[in-house]
A protein has these predicted regions:
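Conserved ATP-binding subdomain of kinase catalytic cores across diverse folds
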Residues: 16-124, 152, 156-157, 162
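Hydrophobic residue at the +6 position relative to the catalytic HRD Asp in the kinase catalytic loop
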Residues: 164-171
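Conserved catalytic core of two-component sensor histidine kinases
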Residues: 148
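Active-site mouth loops of central-metabolism enzymes
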Residues: 136-141
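AlphaC helix of the protein kinase catalytic domain
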Residues: 122-134
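N-terminal positively charged amphipathic segments used for targeting/anchoring
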Residues: 1-14
Length: 174
């Protein structure tokens, strides 16, 4: 078993089973799939995003392998990617809790909790009206250059973001 807890979870979950505690978190559900749940919650007055993985089964593992993709077995890959991005200076979210238990890769239970990035707007939402209301070329070129810089740093660091879309790039609005 692996368990890493930073505040406020370290204090709030002391003496408790962290896996039971994470499953009990309530909030706005963003994604609910078989074996995986993503939600936004508030703990100690702060916003967090929670991803819980409950195992994907051998069928999903073999399906991924037969299509030449490595399966996502749990939260560990995201935890390691976030740590690596911080090491090389790529701006990204901050993970504050991670847990993984079970040796069977098809049934592994894991979770990751990240601090909410707020206030932000996704680059996708920011650019929605660009067909009707194009931005200044200088702004558009600056955004393209920054996305290219971040993506290049990510790839040079060995991090492969399997769904690298503009909706995952957030602009701070404050």
């Amino acid at each position: 078993m692996k368990l890493i807890l930073a505040e406020p979870f370290k204090r709030l979950w002391a003496g408790r089973d962290a896996f039971d505690a994470v499953e009990a978190l309530q909030g706005e559900v963003y994604r609910e799939l078989e074996g995986r749940r993503t939600l936004r919650t508030v703990v100690a007055g702060e916003g967090f995003f929670v991803k819980i993985h409950r195992g994907i089964g051998w069928g999903e593992i073999f399906k991924n392998l037969f299509t030449a993709k490595l399966p996502v077995l749990g939260a560990g890959q995201e935890w390691r990617a976030i740590q690596r991005l911080h090491e090389v200076g790529v701006p990204t979210m901050t993970a504050v809790a991670y847990g993984e238990r079970g040796s069977n890769p098809a049934a592994q239970h894991s979770f990751i909790i990240t601090e909410e990035l707020a206030p932000t707007v996704s680059l996708e939402d920011f650019s929605l009206n660009w067909v009707k209301q194009p931005p200044q070329p200088r702004l558009k070129h600056a955004l393209i250059a920054e996305v290219a810089r971040m993506t290049g740093m990510m790839h040079r660091a060995g991090v492969n973001h399997r769904d690298c879309y503009i909706c995952h790039f957030l602009l701070h609005t404050d």
